[in-house]
């Protein structure tokens, strides 16, 4: 296959892709479609398995929004345990390399970070296409993300995994991170690739902040004057203890006027529910919503909550921050004060950073806002403006297009 003289060819690789609905799959699918609309001939390599149900298999090939999708076969091994997940990674990366060589050459390659160790594919791709720009868009840092849950014999994988990933990052022309903390982790692996920060965007981007639906707000927060929503995943990487401390500080100061609703799923949800006491009357739970209800819930809240354990700082970045700002809702982040979300929250004045021991201070600010609707409206306006000017899908994809154009201009056209 020869490279098109009229449209440069871009290869995008990610474990899950359209029509999967998980956030990262939709981000990579939208990215591929956006670059196709900007003039690239885009090929996506993914797998034939659904994230939600391994028994569901997608067609081997499909064209969607100008993107040619090629799905390699992957066994129906669970993604919920480390060893089968590593098996899925090894299988998928080997199948991808074989298919990529058949489909290539390309003018540029963008590698995601799923499956685990996906960036290691840069090593054989660099050998096969020494002059093709390889870009790694890192949504999760490996092996750091894996080490957080490896136990027993799997911990022995850490030294060789770090050696492999160090070699992989060195094979990339550009490593795209999600913020300064992630960049510092990636820089520790050595090498001298170019560095860029390009964040994900919100899946829903309304034209203006919408008022809350009274019925949805009552369902989530009862009669509270201020509603704080934690929506999404509650996994090992998330710190719910700080959020419980905030809820209790709010109740001590304002009674039930400030309510927190957890509408989430994940491995830590049962632990969170067990930690809630009978006197936590301003803490509520709601079932995890389907996509049709998510935007109404997001708009029903006054603030959105996010958390990240300090040891996960720089490994992942909570995407709910972007979703909250997109609907014009400020954010409260519980995590390390130097985390990217904390830095942006302070820099853009779009919420509060909940540091250890800081629950009373944030509770006092919330109590004041509960009686200051004009200030709350101003906070919403700042959040919405920050998203539109800094994190919107159009802006991020324009920056991606500029990066791809620069890389193509700096590399000869691949020949095989």
Residue ranges and their predicted role:
Residues 220-238, 243-248:
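Conserved donor-binding/catalytic core segment of Leloir-type glycosyltransferases
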Residues 225, 254-255, 261-264, 269-295:
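Nucleotide-activated donor-binding/catalytic signature segment of Leloir-type glycosyltransferases, i.e.
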């Amino acid at each position: 296959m020869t490279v098109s003289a009229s449209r440069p060819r871009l290869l995008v690789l990610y474990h899950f892709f359209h029509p999967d609905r998980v956030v990262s799959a939709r981000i990579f699918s939208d990215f591929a479609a956006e670059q196709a609309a900007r003039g690239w001939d885009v090929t996506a390599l993914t797998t034939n398995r659904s994230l939600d149900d391994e028994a569901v298999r997608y067609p081997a090939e499909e064209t969607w929004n100008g993107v040619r999708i090629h799905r390699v076969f992957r066994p129906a091994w669970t993604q919920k345990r480390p060893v089968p997940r590593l098996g899925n990674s090894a299988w998928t990366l080997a199948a991808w390399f074989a298919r990529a060589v058949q489909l290539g050459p390309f003018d540029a390659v963008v590698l995601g970070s799923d499956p685990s160790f996906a960036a290691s594919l840069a090593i054989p791709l660099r050998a096969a296409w020494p002059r093709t720009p390889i870009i790694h868009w890192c949504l999760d840092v490996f092996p750091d993300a894996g080490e957080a849950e490896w136990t027993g014999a799997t911990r022995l994988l850490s030294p060789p995994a770090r050696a492999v990933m160090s070699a992989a990052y060195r094979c990339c022309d550009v490593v795209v991170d999600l913020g300064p903390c992630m960049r510092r982790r990636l820089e520790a692996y050595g090498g001298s690739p170019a560095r860029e920060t390009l964040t994900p965007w919100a899946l829903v981007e309304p034209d203006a902040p919408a008022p809350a639906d009274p019925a949805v707000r009552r369902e989530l927060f009862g009669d509270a004057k201020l509603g704080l929503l934690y929506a999404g995943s509650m996994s090992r990487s998330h710190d719910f203890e700080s959020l419980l401390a905030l809820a209790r500080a709010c109740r001590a100061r304002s009674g039930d006027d400030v309510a927190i609703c957890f509408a989430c799923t994940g491995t830590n949800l049962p632990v969170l529910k067990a930690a809630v006491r009978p006197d936590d009357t301003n803490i509520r739970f709601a079932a995890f919503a389907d996509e049709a209800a998510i935007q109404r819930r997001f708009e029903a809240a006054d603030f959105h909550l996010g958390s990240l354990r300090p040891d996960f700082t720089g490994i992942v970045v909570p995407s709910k921050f972007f979703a909250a700002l997109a609907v014009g809702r400020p954010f409260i982040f519980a995590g390390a004060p130097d985390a990217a979300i904390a830095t942006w929250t302070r820099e853009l004045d779009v919420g509060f950073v909940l540091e250890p021991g800081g629950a009373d201070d944030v509770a006092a600010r919330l109590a004041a806002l509960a009686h200051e609707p004009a200030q709350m409206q101003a906070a919403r306006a700042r959040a919405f403006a920050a998203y539109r000017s800094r994190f919107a899908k159009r802006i991020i994809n324009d920056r991606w297009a500029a990066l791809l154009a620069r890389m193509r201009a700096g590399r000869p056209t691949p020949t095989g």
